[in-house]
Structures are given as structure tokens and as C-alpha cells.
């Protein structure tokens, strides 16, 4: 749902939605009156919305828990609480595993580097540069709004996303460029609730149950890095998805699976070529 306060923005938002029709997206323009008839969570000030009919929402924590259970059910080994310090290589230069901070080496036939903004410092050991800019986003979780929206979406004028999750409402947004490790800017968190207050009922009476900030991995050219590293056999990269990690994660997995197994790719080869690690610098000393 693309929620819109200013009626003057409705036409532009509708045009944006229609421009995605060739990719299979269906949209419906809804007046403010009709929106509130369908869902009482929205304030009278909301002029209308563009409903993306094929969109969906989820609980990220439950999704990851389900994925973890599926991995274990298929014989996978998930290691928690261990830090990857580098890579293990065979005498011929092939990457054969990950070296943990404890000194243990986890070996495998193929190694996938998918460490988000930390992919670049890890790749540096191998002489590879993955130009990455951390872009911090914030979210705040609210309980007790009284009424939750039935759909998730984006508040058009503020670019703040909202997502009902069980009995709680999650608000997320901002794109704070800077190095990792800096203190949080609490005004960013306050801005999320201030934005939601303009669109949704019950924000003032709700209480905060969680606050969080995390780094989105933004590459220098805006494209993710997916595929085999030409100079290091056995090493594959899957990172740089910026704000689209959840959506692009599944297709990244399919691409890497085809790469590793040597099977036919389903994605357009020209588009895939733009994402390949071969465009990265390898001038660092390995």
C-alpha cells in the first residue's frame, strides 16, 4: 500500500504503479473514504492510496526461523555465535572453507561470501575489493495502537514503511550514510513515529517494545554482487542488495545455486552480467 496525504501526489503515484504493470504488478487506486471504509486504522487526513494487489507482508523473524528449520531438515549445519575471520585455501589457490576466529576451519566444496557490509573487509584478505557503503536504517516496534492496519506499506510523503506483525506495528526507514559503529541518532527513531502519527490512528497511545538499527550493504555502482570470483576458484559472492535484501535473497540463492551446480540460469544473461564479481578490483595484495 502506498499511502498518500496530499491529493496532488495521487496521480504521480498511480503513474508509478502503472509503469510497473509490464513486470506483472497490478494496482488499484483507492480514495481516502474507501480506504477508511475498508480499514479504520487510517486517519481522515489520508487522501488515498495506491494498493499493490500482488504485494505481501511477513514477519522477518518468523521467516528466518522457518528457513533455519528447513536447512536443518535437509541436513544443513547452522553455527551460531561464531565469527568468521577469513578463508582457507588449498595449495592451488582454491577456496576450500571459512576460518573461524577460534581457529577452526569449516570446509566445503564451495564457499559463498554473503556478509553484507562486512563482505569487503573479509574479501580484502583475498585481494578483492567489494566497494561497499554502509547505509543505516532504523526501526521501532509499537504495541497498543488499538487498531492495526490490515496491510503493510509505505507512507508516501515520508518514505517510512509500516508493517503489522502480530499484535504489534513495525515502523522502518531512513538511509543514514556513514561508517559502521557510530552511535545511534535517536532523532531518526523519533522521526518514524512522528511520520506514522500523520497517517495512522493510535500511535500516541502505543508504547515502544523494541528499537533497532542495521546496516544496508550499498555498492558503489548500485548493483548487487552475485556469482563466482574469477581469480579464486571455489569462491562465490552474494551481497550488495542495499534496501532490497529480503526481496532479492531468494533469486540470489537461485543464481548462486545454478553457478555452483553448473546448471542453466533462469535470469536474463545481460542483467546477470551487470552483477558479476568480475567487475570488482583485484589489485589488493592477496
At which residue positions do the language-model features occur?
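Dinucleotide-binding Rossmann-like beta1-alpha1 core, especially the glycine-rich loop
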Residues: 1-31
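Alpha-helix/helix-capping structural signal
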Residues: 8, 33, 117-118, 251
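Helical element adjacent to the flavin cofactor pocket in flavoenzyme catalytic cores
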Residues: 11-21, 42-102, 106-110
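C-terminal catalytic lobe of FAD-dependent flavoproteins
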Residues: 19, 27, 60, 156-157, ...
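General small-molecule cofactor/ligand-binding pocket signal
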Residues: 28-30, 77-79, 209
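Mid-domain beta-loop-alpha active-site segment that forms a flexible
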Residues: 51-68, 117-118, 188-195, 245, ...
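Short, conserved active-site loop motifs that form the nucleotide-linked donor/cofactor pocket
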Residues: 75-77, 169, 235
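Active-site substrate-recognition segment that forms the wall
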Residues: 84-95, 105-233
Amino acid at each position: 500500500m502506498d499511502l498518500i496525504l496530499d491529493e496532488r501526489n495521487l496521480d504521480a503515484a498511480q503513474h508509478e504503479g502503472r509503469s510497473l504493470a509490464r513486470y506483472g504488478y497490478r494496482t488499484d487506486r483507492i480514495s481516502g473514504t474507501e480506504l477508511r471504509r475498508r480499514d479504520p486504522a487510517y486517519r481522515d487526513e489520508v487522501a488515498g492510496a495506491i494498493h499493490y494487489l500482488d504485494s505481501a507482508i511477513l514477519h522477518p523473524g518468523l521467516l528466518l526461523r522457518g528457513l533455519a528449520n528447513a536447512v536443518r531438515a535437509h541436513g544443513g549445519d547452522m553455527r551460531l555465535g561464531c565469527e568468521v575471520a577469513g578463508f582457507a585455501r588449498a595449495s592451488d589457490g582454491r577456496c576450500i572453507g571459512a576460518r573461524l576466529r577460534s581457529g577452526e576451519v569449516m570446509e566445503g566444496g564451495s564457499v559463498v561470501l554473503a556478509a553484507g557490509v562486512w563482505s569487503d573487509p573479509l574479501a580484502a584478505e583475498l585481494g578483492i575489493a567489494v566497494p561497499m557503503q554502509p547505509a543505516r536504517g532504523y526501526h521501532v516496534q509499537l504495541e497498543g495502537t488499538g487498531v492495526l492496519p490490515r496491510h503493510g506499506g509505505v507512507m508516501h510523503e515520508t518514505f517510512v514503511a509500516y508493517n503489522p506483525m502480530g499484535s504489534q506495528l513495525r515502523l522502518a526507514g531512513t538511509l543514514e550514510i556513514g561508517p559502521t559503529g557510530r552511535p545511534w541518532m535517536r532523532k531518526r527513531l523519533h522521526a518514524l513515529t512522528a511520520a506514522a502519527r500523520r497517517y495512522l490512528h493510535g500511535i500516541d497511545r502505543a508504547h515502544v517494545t523494541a528499537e533497532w538499527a542495521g546496516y544496508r550493504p550499498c555498492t558503489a555502482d548500485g548493483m548487487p554482487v552475485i556469482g563466482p570470483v574469477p581469480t579464486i576458484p571455489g569462491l562465490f559472492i552474494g551481497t550488495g542488495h542495499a534496501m532490497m535484501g529480503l526481496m532479492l535473497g531468494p533469486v540470489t540463492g537461485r543464481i548462486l545455486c545454478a553457478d555452483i551446480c553448473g546448471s542453466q540460469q533462469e535470469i536474463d544473461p545481460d542483467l546477470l552480467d551487470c552483477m558479476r564479481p568480475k567487475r570488482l578490483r583485484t589489485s589488493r595484495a592477496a
